[in-house]
Amino acid sequence: VRAFARRLSKNPKEYARLAIADWVAKNPSISILSDGRIVGYRGLRSDFTAIHPGFGYVNGEPQSHDGHLDNSPGNVLSFPTELIDHDPSKVCSFGLHFGTFTYADGYAKNCKQTGNGVRVSVAVAPEDVVSSPLDSRESKLRTLSFEVIEQVAAPYAETVIL
């Protein structure tokens, strides 16, 4: 927990720090890794690609605007700092989104493109989170980057994962 607090204090935006703290407080089942990153979840198409197309980087390589980013386990996804939308009132805007397991599960179950999708866990650095979109009712956050951990069928039971 100390590592999480240290990393959270490195986030340059006060409103982002408050959004993360609120998100963790309202979602007590959220796990924190020993290095201080928080664990979130994403709902994806069955081929591990994002449901919505968009620009970003996968393992440092730029991807096209109309492509679906590859969220396979082990991949690191990122979004250019200068293009990300910090405004929480813009609910589906530029940046990478992750959320609670329930949020991700809803996306995976309603994946019209490929039938039932998959859910993955992601490790997110608190210093990279930029906002909590207002439509989410504290179920999702927008960030600059995350690392895909693994495919999951349920949320992690542990609060702190070593």
Task: Please tell me what each predicted stretch does.
Residues 154-162:
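Active-site or metal-binding loop neighborhoods of secreted/extracellular toxin and effector enzymes
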Residues 76-155:
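ADP-ribosyltransferase catalytic core
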Residues 1-91:
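ADP-ribose/NAD+-binding catalytic cleft of ART/PARP-like enzymes
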